[in-house]
Amino acid sequence: SLSHTDPDWQWNEFFSTENDSVVWDSVIMSGASHGATTSARFALHQRVDRVVMFCGPRDQYESWQSLPSATPKERFIVLSHVLDTGWTGDNYCRSWEMLGLNKYGPLVDVDLVSPPFGNSRRLITDADVNHDEKRAHSCVTPGKAAVKDNQGRYVHAAVWRYLFDHPVDQVGQAVEPDTNCRKELR
């Protein structure tokens, strides 16, 4: 088991010795793109600590996002770049509102607002990706496409800490659904 092969990482926190199963309340589900969709769908059926979605979820023709959720919706947090085609095509704003995330704060541009971003669950960035929509899709996660400053530091490091560490009981002020977000995309 992981707790035996790498005990320094304290894997026991995530496993129940009583019934040899995962302690899902301690697990953070996270994914990018299709992984964001998978993480959100999983969390509707199984309560988890929180759900961190990068550049997603994108499921513009379905309505599963509005189903009852085993994981409280204030535990869902999203980040996307505004040049990502999922954003420009209104796919993300539709999914985010169907998840009810507007109840936990307005859209917040992380390039203009400092942590804790008004405690919002809906974060966007307009970081410079040289107008490359493909890079925009992947720049919000750590890796080679992530945006760095002149010293080579990730510009979204504080955002990532917020997504994974911010207390889930601290939420932003509810706002009305965005009238500019197209809900019917067929």
Where are each of the predicted segments found?
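Extracytoplasmic/secreted proteins, especially bacterial periplasmic and envelope-associated proteins
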Residues: 37-38, 91-94, 158
